[in-house]
Every structure is written in C-alpha cells, then in structure tokens.
Amino acid sequence: MCYAIPGKIEAIAEKTVVVEYFGEKRKAYNELDDLSVGDYVYAQGGFVIQKIPQDEAESILSVWKETFFDLQEVDLKLSRLDLNQESVSKECLRILDNAAEGRKLSREDILVLIKEKNKSALELLFKVANFLRQKHHKNSCCVHGIIEISNYCCADCAYCGISRSNKNVTRYRMSQKEILEAARQAIEEHGFKTLLLQSGEDSGYSIEELAEIVRQIKANWPALIFISFGEVGLDNLELLYTAGARGLLLRFETSNPKLYKQATGGKDLSSRIAHLKKAYALGYLIITGSLIGLPGQSEEDLLNDIFLAKELHAEMYSFGPFISHPQTPFTGNPSASTETMLKVIALARIIDSAHAKILVTTALETINPDARREALLAGANSVMLNATPLKYRPLYNLYPLRAHEKESIEVQIKDTIGLLMSLGRSPTDLSV
Ligand code: SAM
C-alpha cells in the first residue's frame, strides 16, 4: 500500500511546480534537479520528494482511479450536515451556523463551544468540523511514520515518563546503523513517504551526527524527513534543515507561560517559541500544539493554545491528552477526557479550516481505543504510525499503556488502511 498518489507535473516555474491529480491541481516545491513537464512525482507536505517512471505511475493511477472517487463518495455522505437540531440551544446553533458558513467566530463564541456540555450540541460541533474538513481537504488523510530513536532526555518535565529525573527508565539510544535500517524498512518496505525522527533532548548525539543521519536517509531513500529532538538550538535548526530535514514537530505544550514553567521544571516558554519561529522562517513545516489536561489549565488556556498554534503557522496541529505517569511529579492528576480532546480538535478545524492538518495522537488513542475514528469524524485528517523497532517501544514510556506499543507496523498499517477506507478517506497527502 502506498500513502501517496503519483501526480503529473503540469508546469514548472523555478522551484515551484504544478502537480495534477485526477483533474485537481496543487502547487509543490521542487528540490529535484531533473524534473520536466509531464514527469510523474510523489509530493508530500508541499515538497516533491520523488520522480517515478511513467509506466509505474500509470499502473498505480489505474488502480487508484476508481477507488479514489468511490472513497470520496463515502466521505461526502459521512460529512453531510443538518443544522436543524431542536435539542441544541439557539445560541449554539447560531455559532455553529456561522462556523459552517466559514464566518469568523469571536473569542466569546469559541468559549461558548468549549464550555458546551449538551451531547447533541457536541455531536453537531463535531459534525460541523467534519463538514469543514471535507469541504477544504476532501478525503485525504496523511499517514506518517515515526521512529523514536532515543529515550535519553536532559529535560525535567513534570508530566513526562522519560524526563531525566525518572531513574527507573532503562535508557536506549539507537545507533546510526539501527536508525538507517529502521528508516529503510519504513520507506522501502512499508511505503512511508514522510518519516518523523523523535527523541528526548539527548546530548548523546552530536548535532553533526543527527545531521548525518538525516543526510544519509535523504541520500538513500525518497522521503520527507521531520525531526522532533526538542530544543536543539536555533543555529542547529539551520544545520538540520541544510541536511535535509523539512518538518519540525515541537509542541509548545501550553500557551500559558506560568503553567509551562511549572510543567517543565522552570523552563521559559519563550525559548520553545523562538525555536518554532526560527524553524518557520527557515522553511520547516511546523507541527505543534499542546498537552490538554495539564493540572491548572483553564478553558481559556485551551483556546489560547489553538490560537498560538495557528499564529506559529502550524502545518499540522498536534494536541494530545496529558496522561499521568506514576514516576513523575504530575502523577495522580486526571487525563483530559475524549470529549475535551474532540472539542479541541473540532475547534482547531473551525479556527483554521482551510489550512490545518490535524493529527490524531497516540495519547488520545491510549485513553480511548475508538478515538482515531471519532477524531477523524470531528475534524482530524492525519495519523502517525509507530515504526520504532518493537524492542525499544516499551522503553519510550512517556505515559503508561501507550496504544499500539506491541503492534507490528504491518498490523498498524492494515488496521489504519481498513479504518480509513471505511470512512471514505484515502491515505494520501494530497492537500498540499
Ligand atoms: N524531546 C522532544 C520535545 O521535547 O518536543 C520530543 C519528545 S517529547 C517526549 C514528545 C511529546 O510527548 C511532548 O511534546 C509531550 O507533549 C508528550 N508527552 C510527554 N509526556 C506525556 C504524558 N505524560 N502524557 C501525554 N503526552 C506526553
């Protein structure tokens, strides 16, 4: 199975190319040397990542053609919207009607939605978000792979199971050879077109080593590489970009500077924000968001989190529930509920309808095994599958009982594709 559909180059203007998919045209940034009009390519996240032979492309397209339009039909049916709901308050209906029509909501309106408790109103909120997702992004759903390369961390976050203060963690650091082999398998054998490398803030790798790993992956296999190594330093972001990294996953964790300090052992939020701003200026695709349910977090904070992610030019929003880890200072605090998580996802979709890719996080699936389906029907359109070697997965113990921890990548792919097909989604990155 492949997570991208080949597109045909229709026009080239310097580094910008127009790619055509079954009649739809998208723009992408090209970094390949030998591209001509008429060539077939894979594009991800707005970047051309690989040229493919015409016969190969045409055979993949002929398989996709019917399925592609059939899936769109199913998605369209599932995202129909009916705003005639008697059990929903007039105020809520007014706000949701404005949202569905694409009119900008005031802060007060969004707060009303975030405080809403009525089940029918919430169902309608999720439907509006799903309607907007379909309207702007059609049925595409990104399926990215993640490799967790090390669980060493010099940070001391009060929520995180792999923080430096947790002495009960068995630490691991994958060697360059292991990382390259895991990347090869993910790209070559399992078809991932975008791969995220993640670790704690681990000074055990020099920045040159990390850059070399990115360089080697780029030199050997066609994929878009995202990194998530924490705060690597502003200059090092540039080094990693030059090596070939094109996406940065860095959550700001909370938009509330006081809460951030409490949650991170005294760190300053401004440093994370500076990384995110610099990364955007360098050309990275930004994946960011926050932890929902941190002790002391208010509903206003949640709203500010969504606005901050937007302000930071999130290409993809990543909001996950805080889950209490027994060996951390935040142990015993309750997790955010699925309902709160779905509200945040739906509101992110409403606030940034046309642009946002919204991730269903593993943490959300951990608190609710059906959450992937529920979130995809509440505005989300992106999933990340765990391609870390099985032997290391239990050691990347951010919180207990992580979803999919014991599932092989083959099983994750099969289940994901099954779910996406049942919802009429195509596992593609078309909405570039
Ligand atoms: N070191 C990198 C960083 O700082 O962004 C990436 C690794 S960090 C462990 C990845 C994410 O895990 C964090 O951004 C945080 O939101 C999430 N996380 C850590 N502990 C968690 C917990 N107890 N519950 C839910 N998510 C958690």
Task: Place the predicted regions along the sequence by residue.
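Auxiliary Fe-S-binding modules of radical SAM enzymes
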Residues: 4-5, 16-27, 35-36, 61, ...
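A residue-level detector for short acidic-glycine micro-motifs
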Residues: 8-13, 32-34
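Structural motif
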Residues: 39-40
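Short, charged beta-turn/beta-strand-edge "cap" motif at the junction between a beta-strand
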Residues: 45-51
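N-terminal pre-triad scaffold of radical SAM enzymes
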Residues: 126-165, 171-198
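Core AdoMet radical
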Residues: 164-180, 186-208, 213-276, 285-292, ...
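Conserved strand-turn element in the central/C-terminal portion of the radical SAM core barrel
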Residues: 195, 200-204, 275-300, 319-336, ...
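Catalytic cores of alpha/beta
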Residues: 233-240, 295-308, 366-377
